[in-house]
């Protein structure tokens, strides 16, 4: 059975993330969305909230599980008995960073491989940071994030929401 890990902060999950999850779930028997706990970073959502939001969004994809982890990704992968990392790429700049991370992971564990999936053209500009910025100023985030999480994001900001 092939099992892959799609790691990230997902703060918040975007339609770009969901696209990668959906496509990767068709390539691997099991996909674990690994939600990174970063104690040094104050996120918009707690790790528990992020896990719950993602679970809500992927509930109809039967071979996708969502779990949080802290520490090294390699350690989480060993615990989950996975040897494949899935990463989404939007631009060349993403590739440069992710290539370095892939090489580091390979150095830490030679059995680990990284599979890069290109973002769909309609999501190539999308990031969690840009979604937060738009939402912070009351802009429309419909089409940027799954419908199931729009209200949760809006509630985090004390702004009037503009419908599209």
UniProtKB/Swiss-Prot annotation:
Q: Which Pfam families match?
A: CTP_transf_like
Class of the enzyme per the UniProt entry, highest EC level: transferase
What molecular functions are annotated in GO for this chain? ATP binding; pantetheine-phosphate adenylyltransferase activity
Asked if GTP-binding is a keyword of the record, the answer is no
Q: Which UniProt keywords apply?
A: ATP-binding, Coenzyme A biosynthesis, Cytoplasm, Magnesium, Nucleotide-binding, Nucleotidyltransferase, Transferase
Q: Tell me, in one coarse class, where this protein mainly resides.
A: cytoplasm
GO CC entries: cytoplasm
Site note Transition state stabilizer, residues? 17
Where ATP is bound, by residue?
A: 9-10, 17, 88-90, 98, 123-129
Swiss-Prot/TrEMBL cofactor(s)? Mg(2+)
Q: How is this protein organized at the quaternary level?
A: Homohexamer.
The UniProt similarity line reads: Belongs to the bacterial CoaD family.
**Function noted in UniProt:** Reversibly transfers an adenylyl group from ATP to 4'-phosphopantetheine, yielding dephospho-CoA (dPCoA) and pyrophosphate.
What protein is this chain from?
A: Phosphopantetheine adenylyltransferase
Record the organism.
Clostridium kluyveri (strain ATCC 8527 / DSM 555 / NBRC 12016 / NCIMB 10680 / K1)
């Amino acid at each position: 059975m092939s099992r892959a890990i799609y790691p990230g902060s997902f703060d918040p999950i975007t339609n770009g993330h969901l696209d990668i999850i959906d496509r990767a779930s068709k390539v691997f028997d099991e996909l674990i969305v690994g939600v990174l706990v970063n104690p040094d970073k104050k996120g918009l959502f707690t790790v528990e909230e992020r896990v719950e939001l993602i679970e809500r969004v992927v509930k109809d994809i039967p071979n996708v599980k969502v779990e949080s982890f802290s520490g090294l990704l390699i350690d989480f992968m060993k615990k989950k008995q996975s040897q494949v990392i899935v990463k989404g790429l939007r631009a060349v700049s993403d590739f440069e960073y992710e290539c370095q991370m892939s090489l580091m992971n390979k150095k830490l564990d030679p059995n680990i491989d990284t599979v890069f999936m290109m973002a769909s053209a309609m999501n190539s500009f999308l990031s969690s940071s840009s979604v937060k910025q738009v939402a912070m100023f009351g802009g429309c985030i419909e089409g940027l994030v799954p419908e199931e999480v729009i209200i949760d994001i809006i509630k985090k900001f004390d702004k009037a929401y503009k419908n599209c």
